[in-house]
Amino acid sequence: FLLSLYATSLEHMKSNGVQSLFEKIENPLAAVLAEMEKAGIATDQKRWEAVCHELKVRERKLLSLIYEAAGEEFNVNSPKQLGVILFEKMGMPAGKKTKNGYSTAADVLEMLAKSYPFVKDILEYRTISKLISTYLEALPLLIRPETGRIHTSFNQTVTATGRVSSSDP
């Protein structure tokens, strides 16, 4: 079965003019990607922890500045609570409304930041918070103890543009 599938695929590649691309680029790349997956990605654990610490310090500082500007503590990660603070308590012009309240999407906050500088702190807080939770705290858990490296799966044929992507992580 595989031999007939290969023959059919080869004929299909020839008729579409991509056989050379397959033989000279795609097929050799598969072997390189397999080696890269096996080797894994080295990490500098001490540097990782230092960066994480620096960002957590900055995150706490931003939270303090946000609370000070708002005059109270609230859940900055809650769009509903943030909307109440910005648009009701502080009287900023409300843009889009959603079914759950005021929109606090990045584009809305970026517009507000032009007139209300402290909103930049909220945007920076969101960025740093996302970096910490998505990468700095999550990726070290994916380091394989036997290699001390992160091993991913490279995808050669997933993207529409032809670039290589990775998954898991």
Protein language model features and the residues they cover:
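Conserved "right-hand" nucleotidyltransferase catalytic core of DNA-directed polymerases
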Residues: 1-169
